[in-house]
A protein has these predicted regions:
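Periplasm-facing N-terminal accessory domains of Gram-negative outer-membrane beta-barrel systems
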Residues: 1-8
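Surface-exposed loop and edge beta-strand positions of immunoglobulin-like domains
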Residues: 33-36, 77, 110
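N-terminal periplasmic "start-of-domain" segments of outer-membrane beta-barrel proteins
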Residues: 9-38, 44, 96-101, 151
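Short aromatic-centered micro-motifs
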Residues: 86
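Short loop/turn motifs at secondary-structure junctions and domain boundaries
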Residues: 21, 75-78
């Protein structure tokens, strides 16, 4: 029963009880009205429009996205995909099977149903003291609709100017109550986007390459699209 001097123990973790006004944190909240006005068809398109997010890999084609084709992620302040913590309803998510071009792992936000999204909360400062090292750049919390009852169908159509590329999307959201404290929500979506050739835009035509490994549209430093005369056997 003798008194003993113990070393100080510091405990760090989530769900720490305390007043919400203990410290000011810069949190941006994107509500449903803001999300709808953006006209984004997916979570990837929505996060690409965020000024605080840079360096994301959300391109749908394999030429620019590599192994991350069809996925999307969040990169706050360009500090790296592993430095942004992604939550859904305040819960951590599993890491995607795909790996980014720089070898980073990430949470695939493309698995989050756009139709069921209620709001997005973005903590733009580091929160390592609360969440750990994966929140160095900040935290993005996707909040889903949890009290929806009924059926909601959304149909969209977009067309690129001066091109035949079109994008069609259909999303369905259904919800019903089970008892007094439980809601079940089902969401499904379909997205089809036609391809657009790089030759349809002047700023990408210069980079158009043939299957032989170099561009036939810009040989000899000529303007893109102008014909050239190939002499000799130096070009194959």
């Amino acid at each position: 029963d003798d008194n003993k001097n113990l070393e100080e123990v510091v405990i760090t973790g989530s769900y720490i009880k305390g007043a919400g006004t203990d410290e000011a944190t810069p949190v941006d909240v994107l509500d449903s009205d803001y999300i709808q006005k953006q006209g984004a068809l997916s979570i990837g398109e929505l996060t690409q429009k965020l000024a605080v997010s840079s360096g994301t890999e959300n391109n749908p084609d394999s030429f620019t996205a590599g192994g991350t084709q069809g996925t999307s992620n969040v990169n706050l302040r360009g500090l790296g995909l592993t430095s942004t913590l992604v939550l859904v309803n305040g819960k951590r998510q599993t890491i995607a099977g795909a790996v980014a071009n720089d070898g980073s792992v990430f949470v695939d936000t493309a698995t989050i149903p756009m139709a069921a999204l209620e709001r997005v909360e973005i903590l733009k400062e580091g929160a390592t003291a609360t969440y750990g090292s994966d929140a160095v750049a900040g935290v993005v919390n996707f909040i889903l609709r949890d009290d929806f009852e009924g059926l909601e169908v959304s149909v969209g159509h977009q067309k690129v100017e001066s091109s035949d590329q079109t994008t069609d999307d259909v999303s369905v959201l259904a919800g019903f109550a089970v008892g007094d404290n439980t809601n079940v929500i089902l969401s499904a979506s379909f997205l089809q986007q036609d391809p657009m050739s790089s030759a349809e835009r002047s700023y990408t035509t210069i980079n158009a390459a043939s299957t032989l490994g170099r561009s036939f549209l810009n040989l000899g430093g000529l303007a893109p699209g102008l014909p050239v005369v190939i002499r000799g056997t130096g070009i194959y």
